[in-house]
């Protein structure tokens, strides 16, 4: 039985960030184990072909943990965000220049970050990687937790952290209740090339079926997230590239000129999942294991990184017992408001903008017009977009 201070189940974005943050904040004082089912040299589903938008606040957290310098070279800045409603004049714009920041956020490809994180994890002397391996069974005692792996090894620690994704094996084993809501939408994702250079602009276009988001990437590509009812998404996935681009052009419009090229497409169902509790005895939950959100407004990953930052900070306040109940309670209390507010905001936006009822259509267009003309109304959206929220 090998002794550790912290065992982290899951080595994708949330788990890897937590391990590296603990290493930096404690100057390698804590022994950390990362248990990951996928081998380092294989394609990791947590580091797949998708892109994500890192908010200004998330980048600030990564800077604090000394991770941003490694990620920055492969990140594309978002200098402007344009929000509009299809077939209506209402719109609002947010620009980095108006806010007084270098960028509102940055877009990174998960595959790039995966390679960077794997290299950093392997080089860190206080982190041990168990891969390929998975948590098979968990036993909890008064002052420790035993983590039995499917390769026959057993790890003992003061704290187990679940960062093992939306369908968390650790959470299921320990009976952590999961609340779910099916949005009855499917996200179609792909990279596209447009006629006009994006110039750092991101777009969120609301339609009667769901939002269409385009994020700026390197080489003048755009990362597409197109939310549709499942039957329409199935139809769109079967279209030829030419037909797909034509349909996308109809939904998005001509703000970037002609849609010229589309890469490989993928799709996944959109379901809100969140754990009613994010702690238990000698156990904490972060990232997608704690909550998985609708991609509208790009809040999910950034919320998960705020989980990671708060937990890392609380762990380092009590190094003599990193899994103490007092530390976990402080983590829970810190995260409660942000989790509830972000889940409520994203869910409300989905219901407000993903339909064509006349009353809601009028209300959302009026809201966009007012936000574009009254800066006070734009501030809550702006702070959430930037990730500048209390944690």
Name the predicted role of every residue range.
Residues 1-12, 33:
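Beta1/beta-strand and adjacent pyrophosphate-binding region of the FAD-binding site
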Residues 15:
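N-terminal Rossmann-fold NAD(P) dinucleotide-binding loop
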Residues 23-48:
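Glycine-rich FAD pyrophosphate-binding loop
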Residues 46-86:
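N-terminal FAD cofactor-binding segment of flavoenzymes
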Residues 234, 238-325:
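FAD/FMN-dependent oxidoreductases across multiple families
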Residues 313-391:
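C-terminal helical "tail/cap" subdomain of flavin- and related membrane-associated enzymes
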């Amino acid at each position: 039985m090998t002794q550790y201070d912290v065992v982290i189940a899951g080595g994708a974005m949330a788990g890897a960030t937590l391990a590296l943050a603990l290493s930096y904040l404690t100057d390698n004082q804590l022994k950390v184990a990362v248990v990951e089912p996928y081998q380092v040299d294989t394609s990791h589903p947590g580091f797949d072909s998708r892109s994500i938008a890192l908010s200004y606040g998330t980048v600030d957290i990564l800077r604090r943990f000394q991770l941003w310098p490694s990620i920055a070279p492969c990140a594309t800045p978002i200098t402007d965000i344009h929000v509009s409603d299809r077939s209506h004049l209402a719109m609002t714009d947010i620009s980095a220049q108006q806010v007084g920041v270098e960028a509102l956020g940055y877009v990174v490809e998960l595959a790039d970050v995966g390679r960077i994180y794997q290299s950093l994890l392997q080089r860190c002397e206080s982190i041990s990687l168990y891969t390929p391996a998975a948590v098979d069974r968990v036993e909890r005692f008064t002052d420790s937790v035993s983590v039995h792996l499917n390769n026959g090894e057993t790890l003992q620690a003061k704290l187990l952290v679940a960062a093992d994704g939306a369908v968390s094996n650790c959470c299921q084993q320990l009976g952590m209740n999961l609340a779910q809501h099916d949005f009855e939408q499917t996200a179609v994702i792909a990279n596209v090339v447009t006629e006009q250079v994006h110039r750092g602009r991101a777009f969120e276009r609301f339609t009667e079926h769901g939002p269409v988001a385009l994020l700026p990437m390197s080489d003048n590509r755009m990362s597409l997230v197109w939310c549709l009812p499942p039957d329409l998404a199935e139809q769109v996935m079967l279209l030829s590239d030419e037909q797909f681009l034509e349909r996308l052009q109809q939904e998005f419009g001509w703000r970037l000129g002609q849609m010229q090229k589309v890469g490989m497409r993928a799709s996944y169902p959109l379901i809100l999942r969140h754990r009613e509790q994010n702690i238990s005895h000698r156990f904490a939950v972060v990232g997608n294991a704690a909550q998985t959100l609708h991609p509208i407004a790009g809040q999910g990953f950034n919320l998960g990184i705020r989980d990671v930052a708060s937990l890392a900070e609380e762990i380092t306040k009590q190094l003599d017992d990193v899994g103490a109940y007092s530390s976990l309670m402080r983590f829970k209390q810190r995260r409660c408001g942000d989790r509830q507010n972000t889940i409520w905001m994203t869910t409300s936006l989905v219901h407000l903008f993903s339909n064509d009822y006349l009353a809601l259509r009028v209300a959302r267009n009026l809201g966009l017009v007012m936000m574009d003309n009254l800066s006070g109304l734009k501030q809550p959206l702006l702070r959430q977009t930037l990730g500048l929220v209390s944690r």
